[in-house]
């Protein structure tokens, strides 16, 4: 994934969904985290790049420090849906959210099985969010 594509898609998502995001009362945009090693290899987190552009268009803060990938997971494509979720629940940590942040928008680049969004959403709810809405730029198509 190229960084400029993330900027483009984040901006487009903001233009398309800004009104809905306002209606939902979203208080923070939170990108799905990548493991620090992956970030170093790539130089950036694509979900964070998308989230930054989206946040700019919507005038909502991007908050990337609370949700963290603390453990590297094995290749999830080889796992069953249950294994994926369990691996991700162990790999993701969320700091307690500020008390005034109750409605968040979780952003990722690709929605495959939903396990990543599910694990991150659970962690955000445990950390104090009352509502977690999700936005993904692309999804997997079954053949």
Q: What positions do the PLM features span?
A:
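Conserved PRPP/pyrophosphate-binding segment of the phosphoribosyltransferase/PRPP-pathway fold
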Residues: 1-105, 115-143
